[in-house]
Amino acid sequence: MDKIKVGLQYWIPQHGLTRLVGKLASAKAGSLTTAVIRWFIKQYNVNMDEAKHSDPKHFKTFNEFFVRELKEGARPITEGDEIITHPADACVSQFGPIEDGQLIQAKGHNYSAQELLGGDEKLAEEFKDGSFATLYLSPRDYHRVHMPCDGTLRQMIYVPGDLFSVNPLTAENVPNLFARNERVVCIFDTEFGPMAQVLVGATIVGSIEQVWAGTITPPRGNTVYKWDYPAEGDKAVILKKGEEMGRFKLGSTVINLFAKDAIEFDVSMENGQPTVMGTPYALKK
């Protein structure tokens, strides 16, 4: 059955299905929208007590519900300049060293940092022998993505690609999953060197947005696009630890890359572990 589920993803019209779901999720359908939201909350056991607006009737579209804001103080950010915090509510898929330019996708499946970063060899060199972590956001999770540390945006890269599901089953069976799916790569300069925060698209992920640029996708393209940002001035994008940097409509995966000898992951971190945005993720070395 698992092979059938994975095999079907090669045949379904991924982009067409995603466009359709995106349109439906952004539609203002009144009581029907409310009914769908109520079903989703029950189906995925979504905790609405921590949402700023807990009544499903508040949301005019499903997307508004999906990127719901939390109550003030619901995600306190762990203080300390040396502490890097989790960027999202998620589940740890994989983490560890980047060896020979390769990241672990799942047992028996690796992929290259260079491919993940849109084929940029020079950029990939900045993370040679560094560290990575892959965080999977499930449907029930809070789907805003935040900064794990203070950072100044240097570059944003849109990389076109497929839209396979990114759940654990697919990660274990589709080669180069995260390097073949559509993604938005954000490169930040930090006190401990470069950091990449990559937002990976997936089936029915209708939109990836950034706080400084709005919606990056859709529309979906066939070309890698790059935007460079200044370190100073009116056009500089400087974000503090815990600040929102992007969001998914509907959810997917966040991948972080860190430079060599820059960080050490929290000793309690392990694969399959749920994460809470703002809690300890790593320590600066």
From Swiss-Prot:
On modification after translation, the UniProt record reads:
Is synthesized initially as an inactive proenzyme. Formation of the active enzyme involves a self-maturation process in which the active site pyruvoyl group is generated from an internal serine residue via an autocatalytic post-translational modification. Two non-identical subunits are generated from the proenzyme in this reaction, and the pyruvate is formed at the N-terminus of the alpha chain, which is derived from the carboxyl end of the proenzyme.
Q: Which cysteines are joined by disulfide bonds?
A: none
Q: Where in the cell is it found?
A: Cell membrane
**In the record's cofactor note, how is the cofactor described as bound?**
Binds 1 pyruvoyl group covalently per subunit.
Q: Which GO terms describe its molecular function?
A: phosphatidylserine decarboxylase activity
Q: Which residues carry this modification: Pyruvic acid (Ser)?
A: 252
Annotated GO biological processes are: phosphatidylethanolamine biosynthetic process
Q: In which pathway does it act?
A: Phospholipid metabolism; phosphatidylethanolamine biosynthesis; phosphatidylethanolamine from CDP-diacylglycerol: step 2/2
List of catalytic residues:
89, 146, 252
Q: Which family does it belong to?
A: Belongs to the phosphatidylserine decarboxylase family. PSD-B subfamily. Prokaryotic type I sub-subfamily.
Q: What is this protein called?
A: Phosphatidylserine decarboxylase proenzyme
Q: Which organism is it from?
A: Vibrio parahaemolyticus serotype O3:K6 (strain RIMD 2210633)
Q: Gene of origin? A: psd
